[in-house]
Amino acid sequence: MDMQYRIAELHDLPAIVSIYNSTIAGRMVTADLEEISVESRLDWFQHHTEQRPLWVVEEDGIVLGWISLEPFYGRAAYHKTVEVSIYIHQDARGKGLGKDMLQFVLDQSEALDFKTVLGFVFGHNEPSIKLFERFGFERWAVMPNVAELDGIERDLVILGKRIRP
């Protein structure tokens, strides 16, 4: 794959939302239970900054996935910690793109001045947990039965990695 990573632009938002919405029905990735709209994600899109960006990954002008870095917990003392979200188009899943995307994030740590990365993953989402663990993330917390998806309670696993001192 000849992929390019770039900062997301407003015209990418429909593709970002489409990729996100494609994960909802599977009940493995997001706690949203119904599809979201482009309009409902405008504030989220606009709150990304140079230091906490939203990237798209594209090949031949087609968005294959996106990465969001967001501040953790919204308090000043946590400014060196980020929460990462990685979403991949259904046609691009299972081809190693997730590994490339997570490595891309880790490579940005110095330039974006973060030291710790967190991933919030449902406990039954073994592929995502394995991806993070492959990169040295550890299970820092398990929040048992905090989400209910179609009547089934699910755990939330917080995976963390300290990248640099």
Kindly give the residue locations of the regions a language model identified.
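A short beta-loop-alpha structural element at the N-terminal edge
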Residues: Q4-I16
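Conserved GNAT-fold acetyl-CoA-binding loop/helix
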Residues: V17-W44
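Acetyl-CoA-dependent GNAT
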Residues: E34-D91, L102-Q103, R162-R164
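Conserved beta-strand-loop-alpha-helix junction that forms the acyl-donor binding cleft
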Residues: R93, G119-I129
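Conserved acetyl-CoA-binding loop-helix of GNAT-fold acetyltransferases
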Residues: G94-D107, I129-R134
